[in-house]
């Protein structure tokens, strides 16, 4: 694709790449919050594959002036504000939809992997960013490199960290429901803390997240979950 873009056009086609904070691997405590200059040492195939593509894009920019914007997501979450679109993985692996699914079910439970991390409550801390805010960042990043033909790299997060227990407690508050918690062993390779430093994106792209806190993100995810379950119920009623 990259070769074709430079062959067929007088100007290479701008590329906005969805990368990940997983390229940073296990940052040191003094590297939190994570800036774009934090060393990249991915510890899993997902992070390594994203870093490989980043390096290829950077090489193409240097060799062919390919306009590139690399966006390193932190934990994408939430649903469309209207409730029409949201996370629906099979199998589900993301924390917020797993918690909401457990809350929706009678006698549901959520497994917490690790309660002995060096954090204030012993569980992992993550930086959650709303999917709509990520989409807006893509548009802003594309417009920038169309105009200046540059190479740009940005961390996309809210710059706030929430523990697994805080996610569960916030989801309980939003839904008004209770949930059973099962404590389990750590998962290998889970960093204790991942929090972004998003100031570069805010300064250069004029990016301003509309969902800056966990509760607002979970409310949109819960609206989506209710919409999805109602859709399933209607299909069963109609024999679909």
Q: What does each model-identified segment do?
A:
Residues 98-240:
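C-terminal substrate-binding subdomain of Rossmann-fold SDR/epimerase-dehydratase oxidoreductases
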Residues 14-19, 69-72, 127, 155-156:
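Structural signature of the Rossmann-like NAD(P)-dependent dehydrogenase/reductase core
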Residues 2-14:
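A short helix->loop->beta-strand "cap" motif at the edges of active sites that frequently abuts
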Residues 11-14, 23-70, 75, 82-94:
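Catalytic helix-loop patch of NAD(P)-dependent Rossmann-fold dehydrogenases
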Residues 20-26, 78-81, 117, 161:
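Active-site proximal helix/loop that lines the substrate pocket
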Residues 1-2, 57, 137, 141:
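Hydrophobic positions on the long internal alpha-helix
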Residues 3-4, 58-62, 100-104:
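Alpha-helical segments that scaffold the active site and NAD(P)H-binding pocket
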């Amino acid at each position: 694709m990259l070769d074709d873009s430079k062959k067929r056009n007088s100007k290479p086609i701008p590329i906005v790449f969805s990368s990940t904070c997983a390229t940073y691997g296990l940052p040191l405590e003094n590297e939190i919050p994570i800036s774009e200059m934090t060393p990249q040492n991915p510890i899993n195939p997902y992070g390594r594959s994203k870093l490989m593509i980043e390096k290829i894009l950077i090489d193409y920019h240097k060799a062919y002036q390919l306009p590139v914007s690399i966006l390193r997501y932190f934990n994408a979450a939430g649903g469309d504000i209207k409730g029409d679109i949201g996370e629906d993985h099979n199998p589900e692996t993301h924390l917020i939809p797993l918690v909401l699914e457990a809350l929706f079910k009678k006698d549901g439970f959520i497994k917490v992997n690790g309660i002995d991390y060096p954090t204030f409550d012993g569980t992992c801390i993550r930086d959650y960013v709303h999917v709509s805010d990520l989409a807006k960042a893509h548009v802003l990043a594309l417009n920038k490199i169309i105009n200046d033909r540059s190479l740009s790299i940005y961390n996309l997060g809210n710059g706030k960290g929430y523990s697994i227990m805080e996610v569960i407690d916030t989801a309980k508050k939003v839904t008004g429901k209770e949930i059973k918690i099962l404590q389990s062993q750590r998962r290998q390779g889970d960093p204790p803390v991942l929090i972004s430093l998003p100031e570069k994106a805010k300064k250069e792209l004029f990016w301003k997240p509309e969902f800056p806190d966990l509760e607002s993100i979970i409310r949109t995810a819960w609206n989506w979950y209710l919409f999805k379950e109602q859709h399933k119920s209607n299909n069963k009623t109609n024999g679909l």
